[in-house]
Amino acid sequence: MVYDAAEATGLAPHAVNGVLRLVLIGMLAVGSFGLMSAVLRSAGIGRSGRHPAVVLYPMVLAATLVAGDHYSPITSYNVVLIGSVILMLAAALWVARDKDMVQRRLAWHEPVAMLGLGAVLAATYDLTYVAPPFVAAFVVARAAAGSSARQLLRMASVRRWTYLTAGFLAVFIPARIEIARRCSGSSCYVASDVELTTDVFGRTADRLLTGASPAGWRYTAGLLDRAGISFGFADLARNVLLIVLLAAVAFITVIAARNARGSLPVVSEDSVGWRRPAASLGALGAVTALLPALLVGLSRRTQEVRPQVGEAWRETIMVQVGWSLMATAALVCVFGIARKPGTARIAAALATAILGATMALTLLANARLTQVDRVTPLHAITSEMATAAIHFDPTESGNARRCRLIDDYTAILPNPRQWVSGPNVWSELDELMLSVQGIPYCDPVLHGGNKPANPEIEDAS
């Protein structure tokens, strides 16, 4: 898909990937915002979208999305990793719509749709294994945030979730049996192998902490230090993008402060108050962060590699969404306590200023991470390889140049058991070029070498 789009537009593949990444992050933001606002809406908070916590949530989420590594969901494998989280967010919002949070009979097609959705979630990716408990937590959070928690088991959303779980298990159980059988013979995708040891608790805690912004900033600072690149605080004043961002922050501050007086009395006068929705949203955020962290903590691959705190992994993007929900719950508490109009305005201004600063740090950390990539030989070679695929030279000299690039890439990543190694990338590029151009990316006959075999591949992330 990326190659076809790059060929059609004449853009380099990494530029197309950048556009795709922005689209996916936008969809993630919409889904996360929908999750947060649905919980508060159940409590009668922010139904008009004017509550400061609702207004500030985009800034909260933006501040948490620290890339944290070259192979994080934000920088690599976007469609699979971010797409899996988007799918789970969409599933939760579909299972527990406003009209499903009451007692009613299900239409004939609803069980069928939920069974199908559950099967899709089980067959998509390892990360979506947490979908049933995640959706259940969302249903409970919505019910607990309102005044209908006692009627939870009678709600249509609970029955819809039951069908979703049944469809999920119908695919999940036989799939995991087959995976376990293959892993017992050392012929499975390594990251799918589960191992229950005492190390699970430590790895889960590390993965949970990694989703917090300070951990991402700290890890990125270490990468920059090793690459000899300054974090660049002095560049903030000269960064046009950040100036525009700060102007937007100032605008949001004004809106939040103006809305504080009109919205906060709604919270204090509502029979539910602010404590229950804040607790429900905080609990949902904790579950959202803990489930993927535990899933990856159980992975034998994670226990072997032992990624550092702050080093983004496949689950990090969902953990970050969980942290954003917990931070928003804290904002609901702050604005619930600050009931006087003057105090509410000050609280809104301070919250926006703090979020603006953290968002600027996250943006700067992510921007500096791209500079680390640019100074590494691997990034330069990868860019040249992608450009050579788009602007394909079918001559013998073109083949020689592409083969030299493959050799240089393989010298950096020689292990054929890794997915992104030189031999495996060579095979994939050959397959792509044969389908598009009719000739391989690097002809081993003309190059004077033999194409390596493609052994079992380990997980790259």
For every predicted segment, state its role:
Residues M1-A63, A137-A279, P341-S461:
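Intrinsically disordered, polar/acidic, low-complexity terminal segments
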Residues V19-L22, V95, V120, L294, ...:
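Hydrophobic residues within the alpha-helical transmembrane core of Major Facilitator Superfamily
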Residues G49-K99, A123-T128, A289-A330:
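Membrane-interface micro-motifs in multi-pass membrane enzymes
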Residues V85-W94, A131-V135, G167-A170, V244-I252, ...:
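Hydrophobic cores of alpha-helical transmembrane segments in multi-pass inner/ER membrane proteins
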Residues A92-W94, E110-A122, V140-A141, L291:
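Hydrophobic alpha-helical transmembrane segments and adjacent interfacial helices
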Residues R104-D126, G167-A170:
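Membrane-interface alpha helices of multi-pass inner-membrane proteins
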Residues D126-R142:
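Transmembrane-embedded, aromatic-rich helix segments that form part
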Residues P277-L294:
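Charge-enriched interaction surfaces
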